[in-house]
């Protein structure tokens, strides 16, 4: 526990001392979200964006991205809370709901961007305020965009920019797939978590 605190503190100091322009900062809670945002990072890099930083609470992400991105490991919640309060960047891109409830927003971060890690309805599995404090939302499709606009009207939430990006996770699966593979057909039984 103390080791995580110390590593988190050291990485927070390194992050704040990094004088590079912080254009795109991604935050990931776990390596299990990696496939949900990796295609977005790769597309930004393909378009020539160089100022991409990953802050992660999973040490495995640091190892995975060490040759690709600047990464900072911050796992300790107290240090993470400080990071979120003092963050100075143009875009913070994350998949954390109820922003401003558990972790506070920084006045120095221009745009908070949410991307989905589920294809579910925004009105069925999330809290009413799950997306209230975001500036930009990357929606998986028209159904989510319509639900988000409906919530803005119904609850008088601030209007946000909603961009239909599709589901990044499906891009990741497609990029990994080997379409030339000849296999016998299988039946997949995949129960949902709801």
Give, region by region, the residue ranges found by the protein language model.
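Membrane-proximal basic amphipathic "stem/tether" segments
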Residues: 1-30
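Active-site and donor-binding regions of nucleotide-sugar-utilizing enzymes
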Residues: 23-174, 191
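Nucleotide-sugar donor-binding and catalytic loop/hinge architecture
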Residues: 12-22, 174-193
